[in-house]
């Protein structure tokens, strides 16, 4: 066999890890065994909008997968009430365990029964994994015993006696609680191989910061950014406009816990400024939306701050629009179109009276200029966002594990839309002198979004990237937004409902056509019956009969209303998707009451399941992206074995096998 210099160099590098024929052959055999296993379960979620309790519950329950495993393993032999208790214990072991213990008359017997049930369940969920993989999932401090309990063979000894003796030792040495908790965590770990979050972790919900904590602790997760995410990414990067934008949303819902409690960002200077500047103003239009879960506090103070940051936001929007003509947002620099004496605005040729004409900080001769006090507030907030260690960790995680889109195991994941023309062609959007569409546009947006955080501080490239992050939040041709305009100004200042309409991109009309879904998949290099698009962003109005399944079953929108504000519009509380070795399962969820009720009353989210794609045969690891990489490694290892056997590369010292 002839070897190129490059191939030989690679094989020599590979030989450093696999130093003998035996070592390389053993790895080939190990990989071939892995490739024959069923593919792992993938879990898809989208549009979390800060609803951390519902998110954590669905994450812990794996959208009902764990309860299904419990019912399969324990069946009718265990009462439904006890199965529900066991499910809650697995979801929330640290919180549920003390409550269950307090109820027991014979704690020793309960420990024994619970550990046996958890062992059986854990053996079941680990059955589609190699023993080596399961071992890597076990906690170090008790991994050996867990491994023994999971992989013991009973051909020559009694199972009940073997388990019984080990469990007795665990209980005797006061380790039962620790082992129960570890088993619960391992079951959740093995039930789902990969988590996909298709955007919008941030928004109006009570604690988006707590949502980010969970993916950061997850073993394998990817995120496709939503427009609510990129504006927070821009804020963390140091964009004053993105900061004012996230503050506006936060204050509109009086959600100060996220900023002050979650990220340690003080709004004291802003509060003093707003109190002084708008002390005599009517701020009734600026009162926060009611949500009993967010801090009550002084609503008038929140309203004043809401108005203060909105005016600063409008000024900064005008500045960004002026220095980015290719955003094509001319006319949306509204402060430049207001007649302050008359109290009207020229809105694209129509003159409207303003619902609020009070602009004490605006200079009519230079409406976009911040006052000296506003400059100080903006600078302090930029510094506070930059110095929030927790926020920076969260945003760095979003950049490291997130992207504009992802292709995984034949599926295409993105949050918003592929911009289209009225006739269904990919719309060509021009930035920096070049028109791009489809995948090329997505790749460009991904690069510009990273530029806003990673380019050198103070550089023109970083400023341009931060401006682009704001454009991705609300731009008319932003693939993450997908509407004609974000009508924040119109809803606050103009009474005419016609001015408040946000027209959806033609994409949302064309995705009903199977040819559109297939066209998008081909654009990203995907094809075949098993390839699907997983999309979010636009809540599906299930209450009106709308289906989340579009494009002849090739596109699934899984934004069904995680956000509580959308429940009335959608009629449900969200969709999730499960992709296992049998196919794709859509889960439709009803509203979630609270974690407290789930823990103390064993209340689970009511859900229904629907297979939307059934694989013609069971999907194995060899059929996945990882399987493709493993098969490539087998080819390389086979070439290495041949190189050893032909004497092209010398074997190292044989290790004991």
Where are these regions (language model features)?
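Feature recognizes metal-dependent phosphohydrolase scaffolds
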Residues: 1-657
